[in-house]
Amino acid sequence: MKYLLKTQLPLLLLIGMVINGQQSQEGHLLLSQLEIENTDQPWWPATKNKAITNAPIKIAGNPYKHGIGTLSGSRLFFFLDGRSSDFKCHVGIQDKQDPAENVQFNVLSDGSKLFYTQQQGEKTFVGIANTKNNIGKGSVRFIIKGDGKTLWKSKKITGGQKPQPVKIDLSGIQVLELSVEDNGDGISGDHAIWAQPTVTYTSFKPQLVDANYLNKLKTVDKNFTNKIKPLVQELPMGQGEYVQGTKADWLVNDINLPSKVYQQANGKEIVISNGLVSRTFRLTPNCATVGFTNLTTAETLLRGVGPEATITLDGDEYVVGGLDGQIEYGYMKEEWLEQMWSPPNSFQLSNFTVGTIKKRINWPNKRWSSQPKGPIKGKHIGFDYTHPKYPDLAVTVHYEIYDGIPLISKWITLKNNGQKAVVLNSFKSEILAMVEAESAVEKQKGWETPNIHVESDYAFHSMSMKNANKVVHWEKDPRYTSQASYLLSTPCLLECKLPIGPNKTLDANGTFQSFRVWEMPFDSHDKQRKALYTNAMYAKIAPWVTENPLFLHLTTTDDDKVKAAIDQCAETGYEMVILSFGSGLNMEDLSKSNIEKFKALADYAHSKGIELGGYSLLSSRWISEEVDVINPETGKRGGVIHGSSPCLNSQWGIDYFEKLRTFFSKTGFDLLEHDGSYPGQLCASTSHIGHKGLEDSQWKSWKRITDFYKWCNENGISLNIPDWYYLSGSTKNGIGYREVNWSLPRERQLVLGRQNMYDGTYDRLPSMSWTFVPLTEYHGGGAAATIEPLDTHLGAYKAHMIQNYGMGLQACYRGPRLYDTEKTKATVIEVVAWYKKYRDILNSPIIHLKRANGREIDGIMHINPALQEKGLALFFNPTNKTLTQTINLPLYYTGHSKKVQISEKDKEKVEYELARDYLVELEVQIPPNDSTWFVIY
């Protein structure tokens, strides 16, 4: 059955009803076309276009093709939405039939019998009486009500009486009720007929609803009128740049426009906007996103309405908010919203709150970074939802919009305020019917997706965002039947959902917070401009990634050598020593001697103004059968990502993180270099203490490791992790290189290193990555590959430092020392001093000018219109001859539009006029295998 009123539809169904057809603008509806047979009435279901006895409809000899066959005691309810004009029908009692053959019966509580026949499993009603031969002729009264008030009531109607015509005005009626009452002489023979029951409607097609629907409407209307609407009215009206968008380019100009939540003139919608992006929510008959606009281009991103989220509880899926009834999913018109209803069985909006953005992670910002201390500015709005089946479960959908950047964040939370446990099997925290990026008729090998950046903090098992982004999916939208694709395969439905689980049990007072997603529409397809968007996003939502301490990768834990390295760092301007892999550091050793050893070294480093960090390996380890991840395919350990790995939710895994917390707390270490971080593997074990089984293993593991990373971040512990954990507190990731390349000859390392940095600084800030310099042998290569002795290979050593620091990256200078002679020391001091002088601009986003190819000048340019140094361009000559070239330097993103001053290597400034395309012609001459740099003021 599609619709069974006897099962009590969830309260707050609202205007939702299960239908198959689409709305019509105007027409006449025979109510018998609806799912009448699935309604609830005493003794036997109503019948469509037949009498209750399944015979053709006939009243006093008058046949009718259409009608509803019922019994006395029946009540039928139809939602009209106040947009029907009249109701017409004929009423009467079905003519008596000859006694049926092979009649069976059930005895009723009053001693009478319900007679029926049965053929091939199908039962047919005959009547109610003491015997099958004395079924009465029937005697009833028909009643028509509108919104609970009687509109018409018949006199006594008996069997054999001619049909009575009825015509009722329905103007303004929300719910129409058709009922039949017994006339006091019993139900026998009360085979009532609503013949040709026709409603004339405009714009909204009547729908079958349940008996409590009117009360539901009143409840919803009351909640909107008494609670939601007053909250809306407290908000300001939208105007100016919040509605039309700001005209300035936010990548060049500081947008001093605080985010705002405002109301629409219709009183039913509210908008979050910062002048760059906006999202519109309609709050009645349920809450739904009905607008998503890129205000920088005035582009509408949304083509359809859907739920705000879906959640599967105890095995059943429920929609959260949303609207149904859109007649076309290729586009959306505002007037259609008035004709839409809340989805059946949905969580209903009960309240909303507006506030400011709260920090996700309380980053202490204790070392150098390009981001100032202070709060992240913007607005937060939370929409609260309830459901009658889960009266103690609070569901909230959260949004944040950030000042000065076209960026919105979203996540959901659940709280169980009752005593009965609830299982959250799965969820979708975002569902958006977006305008497609391309319209292709045939099957595509690769589809272009909408031009919007969507990223989540639920990320792992990759050093790039594209591969680490595990929850963002562009799906087909089967509702979009008018799309160009014959197979309806256009990926234009954004869904954010877990690969599996979380299968989270919410006990009494239990809570759940989903992953977050961030959504940022681009205004261009230009790769460089889109890169500047994401650079700005990371600085805004994960400001800790702008930390960029200068560090030495030390390969020993010998006290004297560590102290000597610390001394060298202090003398040259370096800021941190990292006890690297292979150094002998074991953070899992909490013995008194181990803690005392490394606390003493940390104390010594701090006394010199140097920080101390170290390496720990998590994944790609074989621990034991009881501890390791169980492969779901084999039921045994092994054969998973990294070969074998400990399950983070085994007792060993839980103890591992506690050991690291203890080590850092007792030693005062400042950085964790965490190798083999959690790669998202599933664990099929049912004996690990921290998870129930396969379905919750990934979520629990991700939660455990990201909770640890957040703890580190909040305690001032910097995090170097070769994985995409930035949004969970990590500060650095590898730039993306092939490790064996560091065993190649030095001159090849330099060119390949610049290629790696050039490619790896599009989607992220320079400070977000590390690169590598093998001071000592690494993966082979011998003397031709290493920098040691440093003085002997000082040219290569300096070249590495210039290109790394010049591009804003720290490198893992892996070896026992920073210098071996006074000459080497002076060179290190010179480069570090240069870096620190221009540190702000060198840590700013990069404009990619020319990728290194080993044959000609290559280079990049940092830009930051907020600084005194608006840009710094760095060029390299990889050849054995002097190269001279006129370079068109693009200065648009420096903020200059007319004139600019440029200085080469701190020489006298030269003034240039910008061309109409913001270019200046710069004459560049570079000696063989050397570099030069220019500062733009």
Predicted regions and their residues:
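Conserved structural scaffold segments of CAZyme catalytic domains across common CAZy folds
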Residues: 228, 320, 325-628, 654, ...
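Active-site-proximal substrate-binding groove within the catalytic cores of carbohydrate-active enzymes
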Residues: 270-275, 279, 286, 292, ...
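Active-site-adjacent "subsite" loops/lids of carbohydrate-active enzymes
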Residues: 598-603, 607, 611-669, 678, ...
